[in-house]
Amino acid sequence: MKLAYFDCPAGISGDMCLGALVDAGVPADYLIAQLAKLPMHDEYRLHFERVVKNGVAATKARVPLGERAGHTHRHLPEIRALLETASLPPRAAEWSVRVFVALAHAEALVHNTTPERVHFHEVGATDALVDVVGTCLGLDYLNIEALHCSALPVGGGLVHAAHGVMPVPTPAVVRLWESRRVPVYSNRIHRELVTPTGAAIACALAASFGEMPSMAVLRVGLGAGDMDLPIPNILRLWLGEATEPLLAARARTVTDVHAHAHHDHSHEEVVACLETQTDDLNPQISGYLFERLLAAGAADVFTVPVGMKKSRPGTLMTVLCAPHLLSTCEEILLRETTTLGVRRHFQVRSVLERHHEPVETIFGTVRIKVGSRDQQVLNAQPEFEDCRRLSEQTGQPLKLVQQVALATWHQRRPTQSERQN
């Protein structure tokens, strides 16, 4: 299992990623040849050079632009079409689209519009395309199966952007961090350390943020940024082989699922799955066990009747929990049941953005749980406990309270044409 880790003490930007990849062994000629497949080769030049930052040598990617580049501002549909028709390696093309979709959603939230309507200056700019696509080409060339990223420095101060002077971190970067709950910190350097392009690359491609995963180090590439800072303005790209089987399994799952991810407020998350079956457990203990596991933080617990050896009827119990709770839940299963072993593996589940919308019905207030993706509502259901409480208070059938609550919610929602206006 080949892992990569972005170590970002001085932040992250697209050109730093490119430089680190070339420093780690990706041939510059390969990147230049692949990028030439994009119908924009007359808008830029790409070259790499060795520089020294605070006494540390690193590789700097430079993308000087031609005159035509200054007049080109692409929208998301144009970028998607450009990438999907360029005959790039499939993974690199798919990852590139994912990065731009992530950034489009962040910009849309900032400007109160839709991702397709975002007028990109930074994102549609030629150098951003070179940085993003080049980074994805490099990761694909190195056959990276899982990418991880360190916590990111927030920076500070002000920066001039297409919409005027902005505080650092810029609004789009903040939205990207929100989408992945990225751990951030202050290193007391008040400059723009994380660019929108760098944040989008990390948030769209990294399986996790935080400490470096356990790996046998193969190579470390150093990519330099533009500014001179109190510390070396360098991104370190660590390449290695995973050394823990459980970690490797988890990383592989994250990589596979991220290849089909939708990067909006919906997300995909790794869950630990524990399973055990018994044929001699007192049924009274099962209810108590459910309570113990849920109180410990398990996301779900369920049982299924199964046929076991010697034709005995038994029960298969499955526990879903966050990976960091695996040991806790496993300990409860081993202590409280009659099992002699517990199976465990990692799975990935897609999770819709979820929020509650209260509605006033003729019976009282009911919260509607709404699930959405890409700003489109996919599911809506009344909260059971609210409906049960109102049913008990009013004497009305529970199913009627549920039906009225959902109908009331649908009536108050705007139509598609009203939302577009």
Swiss-Prot record:
GO MF: lyase activity; nickel cation binding
Keywords from the named record: Nickel
UniProt-listed PANTHER family: NICKEL INSERTION PROTEIN-RELATED, PYRIDINIUM-3,5-BISTHIOCARBOXYLIC ACID MONONUCLEOTIDE NICKEL INSERTION PROTEIN
Designated name of the protein: Putative nickel insertion protein
A Pfam family the protein falls into: Ni_insertion
Family the entry assigns: Belongs to the LarC family.
Organism (species): Gloeobacter violaceus (strain ATCC 29082 / PCC 7421)
Xref: HAMAP family: LarC
InterPro entries in the cross-refs: Ni_insertion
Keyword Cell inner membrane in record: no
